[in-house]
């Protein structure tokens, strides 16, 4: 059986932790930031986690993580 391929787009965006949780960064933090307030930008710096079916789908794309 051939090796499974890692989905490179998913590999760049998600990280599977030891606990099995899938970590991701938040959107809306790359440009057009001047009108966003400091509190909002500070919240966007923090990572968040996928749950349920979303996490399962991403894990399927990352077979070696």
Swiss-Prot record:
Gene3D superfamilies: 4.10.410.60. One of its GO terms (biological process) is translation. InterPro entries: Ribosomal_bL35, Ribosomal_bL35-like, Ribosomal_bL35_CS, Ribosomal_bL35_sf. One of its GO terms (molecular function) is structural constituent of ribosome. It comes from the Bacteria. Keywords: Ribonucleoprotein, Ribosomal protein. One of its GO terms (cellular component) is cytosolic large ribosomal subunit. PANTHER family: 54S RIBOSOMAL PROTEIN BL35M (PTHR33343), LARGE RIBOSOMAL SUBUNIT PROTEIN BL35M (PTHR33343:SF1). Belongs to the bacterial ribosomal protein bL35 family. This is Large ribosomal subunit protein bL35. It comes from Thermoanaerobacter pseudethanolicus (strain ATCC 33223 / 39E). The gene is rpmI.
